């Protein structure tokens, strides 16, 4: 992984040492700067100002970010001849900022059909666009792992679908992971992003691209989530708990970048594409109970090994029960009942063409997972 990760309490203060190598014109990408984010922005802006860096701000990022938002960011970056992009926020901001830096071009226009066809393989080696600029990530949540992956996901609202772009150029040049920036994240957001951490570690292990290194990282991340995510929800300002989840997120992100995800991610993206109001973590929670019932029967050895590595075997608890218990502890188990998905949306989700091409193709099991999750 080409990203330099600066992890730990207070590492945000190292920004003044990092920035000078990347130029004099910076585009800061974020959600609207209010509340605790406003103080962080003021701190970052002061650091940049003190070292003579001109800043431009695009704070129009929304949850489940859109191609329209990326288009606007690319326009700002291109018209102002930005030297580098600084993303400040969670997964939605990271993915948007990555794409803005990667797709910056002199014409300020993006052909999304071309982008999705050209950059659709996480492990393909190819040149990045000639006008791309470096991206620096400052994480404010523990969830997406986007600060250490080569992927970015955005929504096409017109087509009601999510687009995933892959390229090694989407790895940040530097990622600052400072748990102090995460102390004010609301519990609902911590639940959704925290479960995404688990999903990355778990699903990357279930695939066929694991290695001894990624297996160890998966097991460590899973153990950390099992122990510390419920604690974070109950005691959100505990810096130790936040640090543990931030480290789990980083480990799981590295696992994801090497091993990829399993069925819940594309299934969740189908739901999120049609219902962009539902967070990514919540869409995963919707499909997970049914996915577990399916997966434990076809991957019993992997489930057994996780049970051994997490101590579940010793207490006679199944992995499926433990994951469902975790979902209950973080108030995500009944996500479908709280998501207000309409009957028309259920129909669109159930008939989505992607369900026919996910592996194994035309599998009734995949459709059953989705349909049973929407009851």
Identify the residue ranges that each predicted region occupies:
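Short alpha-helical scaffolding segments that buttress acidic/His motifs in well-ordered protein cores
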Residues: 198-202, 242-253, 288, 323, ...
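Carboxylate- and glycine-rich phosphate/diphosphate-binding segment that chelates Mg2+/Mn2+
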Residues: 149-258, 361
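ATP/NTP phosphate-donor binding region
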Residues: 1-84, 336
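C-terminal charged capping/lid subdomain of soluble metabolic enzymes
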Residues: 307-375
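Active-site segments that bind and position negatively charged phosphate/pyrophosphate groups
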Residues: 204-322
């Amino acid at each position: 992984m080409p990203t330099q990760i600066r992890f730990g309490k207070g590492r945000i203060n190292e920004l003044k040492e990092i920035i000078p190598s990347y130029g004099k014109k910076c585009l800061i990408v974020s959600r609207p700067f209010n509340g605790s984010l406003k103080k962080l922005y003021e701190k970052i802006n002061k650091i940049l100002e003190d070292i003579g860096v001109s800043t431009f701000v695009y704070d129009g990022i929304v949850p489940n970010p859109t191609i329209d938002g990326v288009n606007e960011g690319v326009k700002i970056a291109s018209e102002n001849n930005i030297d580098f992009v600084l993303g400040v926020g969670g997964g939605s901001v990271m993915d948007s900022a990555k794409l803005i830096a990667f797709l910056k071009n002199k014409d300020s226009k993006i052909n999304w059909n071309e982008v999705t066809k050209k950059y659709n393989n996480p492990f393909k080696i190819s040149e990045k666009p000639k006008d791309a600029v470096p991206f620096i990530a400052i994480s404010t949540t523990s969830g997406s792992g986007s600060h250490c992956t080569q992927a970015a996901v955005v929504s096409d609202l017109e087509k009601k679908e999510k687009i995933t772009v892959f390229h090694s150029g989407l790895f940040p040049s530097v990622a600052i992971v400072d748990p102090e920036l995460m102390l004010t994240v609301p519990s609902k957001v911590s639940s959704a992003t925290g479960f995404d951490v688990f999903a990355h570690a778990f699903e990357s292990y279930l695939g066929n691209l694991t290695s001894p290194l990624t297996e160890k990282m998966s097991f460590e991340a899973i153990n950390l989530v099992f122990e510390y995510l419920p604690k974070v929800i109950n005691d959100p300002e505990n810096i130790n708990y936040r640090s543990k989840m931030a480290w789990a997120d980083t480990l799981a992100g590295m696992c994801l970048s090497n091993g990829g995800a399993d069925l819940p991610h594309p299934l969740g993206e189908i739901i999120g594409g049609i219902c962009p109001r539902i967070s990514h973590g919540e869409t995963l929670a919707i499909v997970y109970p049914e996915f577990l019932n399916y997966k434990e029967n076809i991957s019993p050895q992997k489930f057994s090994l996780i049970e051994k590595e997490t101590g579940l075997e010793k207490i006679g608890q199944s992995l499926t029960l433990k994951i469902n218990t975790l979902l209950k502890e973080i108030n995500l188990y009944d996500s479908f009942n709280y998501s207000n998905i309409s009957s028309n949306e259920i129909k669109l989700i159930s008939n989505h063409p992607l369900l026919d091409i996910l592996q194994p193709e035309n599998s009734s099991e995949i459709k059953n997972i989705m349909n049973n999750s929407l009851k």
